């Protein structure tokens, strides 16, 4: 494996140009400058992964064992993990199944609909009953 020097992410970030390109993958720092032109995905893929932890980018592709072996030759040191920002994931806030504040409003609206409907039904029933009894 390559050198044992420890770099900060700020130091690695200074190497993000086509003529000087370093990547952080799996806690190691790699100088991939000479490989930019030979990379099957093109130089832009590697350049877009500079100045950050590119481990997820690398693993998502599913590189071959020969690609991983090539990395050993490009290793220039380790990354100081305390300089890499922690990944935050979005966790939606927990909400009740119903909005407790709006439940009374829902009941009021339901009653505003049902009470006139019941009154109308009773009025029609009384009229129908009176019509039947008069015949």
Swiss-Prot record:
Cytochrome b5 heme-binding domain ranges (all copies): 4-80
UniProt source species = Cuscuta reflexa (Southern Asian dodder)
Q: Which PROSITE patterns match?
A: CYTOCHROME_B5_1 (PS00191), CYTOCHROME_B5_2 (PS50255)
Q: Which is one Gene Ontology cellular component term of this protein?
A: endoplasmic reticulum membrane
Membrane-spanning residues: 106-126
Provide the membrane topology annotation: Single-pass membrane protein
Print the keywords alphabetically.
Electron transport, Endoplasmic reticulum, Heme, Iron, Membrane, Metal-binding, Microsome, Transmembrane, Transmembrane helix, Transport
- The primary site where this protein sits is endoplasmic reticulum
Task: Give the record's family classification.
Answer: Belongs to the cytochrome b5 family.
Any one Gene Ontology MF annotation carried by this entry is: heme binding
Q: Does the keyword Transport apply?
A: yes
Recorded protein name is Cytochrome b5
Q: Which InterPro entries does this chain map to?
A: Cyt_B5-like_heme/steroid-bd, Cyt_B5-like_heme/steroid_sf, Cyt_B5_heme-BS, Cytochrome_b5
The record describes the protein's role as: Membrane bound hemoprotein which function as an electron carrier for several membrane bound oxygenases.
Family annotation (SUPFAM superfamilies): Cytochrome b5-like heme/steroid binding domain
Residues annotated for heme binding in this entry: 39, 63
Q: Where in the cell is it found?
A: Endoplasmic reticulum membrane; Microsome membrane
